[in-house]
């Protein structure tokens, strides 16, 4: 009887130990499940962060492409502005050359007119001198008449030359007026061109400032891309570590569940053994 009691006490102690181990296994399994759930939650959070970083990277790349496109447009605008400035400079040079030629033609016509006027004045003075003298001498009269004829001829020639010069002078004056109008137009155009050049210069300065700002933004975008790539790699590494941790915890959970099943089977075996022992005691 004492042996049976000792055996029952030993079996009860073993049962209690099995129960304690089973409870411990269950607690360890619950703890492992909690750690696994936390690891999975952290993995999901990391996945969301990775997705957000990838979206930020795509947005930054798109902004960088837009900045590069704007820089290309500004480069084209700058080239067009430089071409316009060169064309305006050529037009100004042509206007200045045309004005110089008109001034030279005006000076030549003025000199010819002065010569013709001087010749006409000299002929008129000679004619008046011949008329005032009233020479009685026939030969002298003939000579004077001849001189007068010559003077008249010279005067007529001078008049013709004067008319020709006057006609040419009128043409020159008309050309001069047109040249002056063109000069005034050219001056106005020069003022406009200078204003356009000033505006183009300001635009060029603005483009240079915009280009510097665009370069700074491009450097900032590159730095952001670099930072995002670094964060992406870190997040991927953490995600991989979390996945490995989840797998490790899952293996631990599986092991504890197997151990729990084994302890439950052992506990069942002890209970069955106790039942058999009680049955034997009752039967005896």
UniProtKB/Swiss-Prot annotation:
- Annotated coiled-coil positions are 1-284
Q: Which InterPro entries match?
A: Tropomyosin (IPR000533)
Q: Pfam families attached here? A: Tropomyosin
Database matches in Gene3D superfamilies: 1.20.5.170, 1.20.5.340
According to the lineage, what is the superkingdom? Eukaryota
Q: Which UniProt keywords apply?
A: Coiled coil, Repeat
Query: What is said about the domains?
Result: The molecule is in a coiled coil structure that is formed by 2 polypeptide chains. The sequence exhibits a prominent seven-residues periodicity.
Q: Which family does it belong to?
A: Belongs to the tropomyosin family.
Q: Note the PANTHER family from the entry.
A: TROPOMYOSIN
Q: Subunit arrangement?
A: Homodimer.
Write out the function statement from the record: Tropomyosin, in association with the troponin complex, plays a central role in the calcium dependent regulation of muscle contraction.
Q: What is this protein called?
A: Tropomyosin
Q: Which organism is it from?
A: Blattella germanica
């Amino acid at each position: 009887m004492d042996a049976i009691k000792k055996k029952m006490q030993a079996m009860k102690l073993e049962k209690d130990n099995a129960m304690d181990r089973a409870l411990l296994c269950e607690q360890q399994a619950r703890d492992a499940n909690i750690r696994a759930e936390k690891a999975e939650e952290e993995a999901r959070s990391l996945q969301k962060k990775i997705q957000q970083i990838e979206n930020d990277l795509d947005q930054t790349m798109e902004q960088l492409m837009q900045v590069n496109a704007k820089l290309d447009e500004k480069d084209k605008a700058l080239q067009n502005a430089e071409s316009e400035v060169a064309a305006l400079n050529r037009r100004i040079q042509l206007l200045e050359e045309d004005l110089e030629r008109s001034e030279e033609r005006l000076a030549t016509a003025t000199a010819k007119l002065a010569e013709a006027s001087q010749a006409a004045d000299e002929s008129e003075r000679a004619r008046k001198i011949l008329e005032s003298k009233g020479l009685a001498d026939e030969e002298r009269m003939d000579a004077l008449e001849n001189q007068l004829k010559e003077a008249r001829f010279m005067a007529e020639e001078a008049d013709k030359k004067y008319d020709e010069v006057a006609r040419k002078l009128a043409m020159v004056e008309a050309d001069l007026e047109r040249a002056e109008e063109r000069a005034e137009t050219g001056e106005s155009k020069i003022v406009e061109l200078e204003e356009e050049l000033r505006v183009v210069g300001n635009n060029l300065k603005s483009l240079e400032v915009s280009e510097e700002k665009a370069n700074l933004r491009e450097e900032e975008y590159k730095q952001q891309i670099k930072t995002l790539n670094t964060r992406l790699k870190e997040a991927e590494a953490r995600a991989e570590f979390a996945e490995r941790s989840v797998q490790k915890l899952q293996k631990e959970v599986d092991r504890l569940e197997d151990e729990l099943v084994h302890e439950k089977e052992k506990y069942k075996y002890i209970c069955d053994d106790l039942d058999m022992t009680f049955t034997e005691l009752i039967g005896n």
